């Protein structure tokens, strides 16, 4: 099956210009199904929140590889924009404004990011004589809240249209 033109490749997936104003994020072969489902469910949980983001439409299976269909967002990455313009201050302003708009939307129906971090810490120490105890204790001391944590917020993951 033709997935369309490749428009990006990352650590976990390749993104294709799919059809009808949508892109396909096709996860690399062997990427865990539960991780794909978690990404889809987390994205769907954002549907009613007031900040710009692509909408997810569903999980697809293409020749044994799982993918998620998203809205196609046109624009350039903030990384490319800042390299083109040299406007570091403008980049910081765009990122701060977007980050504020994300934080202005409390969210309650997604998994705890603290629990996610603790789980990853435990996995990273598996088979080691060291223990993640100190770090997990610090995480436990952080307050719980309803703020959304993107987890991968950087200029390469932000698309802009003519400087906005």
Q: How would you name each of these model-derived features?
A:
Residues 79-113, 132, 138:
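Conserved kinase catalytic-core helix
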Residues 55-66:
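Short beta-strand micro-motifs within the conserved protein kinase catalytic domain, predominantly
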Residues 1-5:
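Conserved N-terminal boundary motif of the eukaryotic protein kinase catalytic domain
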Residues 64-77:
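Conserved short submotifs of the Hanks-type protein kinase catalytic core
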Residues 9-36:
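ATP-binding glycine-rich loop module of kinase domains
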Residues 27, 60, 73:
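Residues forming the ATP-binding cleft of Hanks-type serine/threonine protein kinase domains
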Residues 104-151, 156, 161-162:
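An alpha-helical support segment within catalytic cores of ATP-dependent transferases
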Residues 33-49:
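The N-lobe alphaC helix and its flanking beta3-alphaC-beta4 segment of protein kinase-like domains
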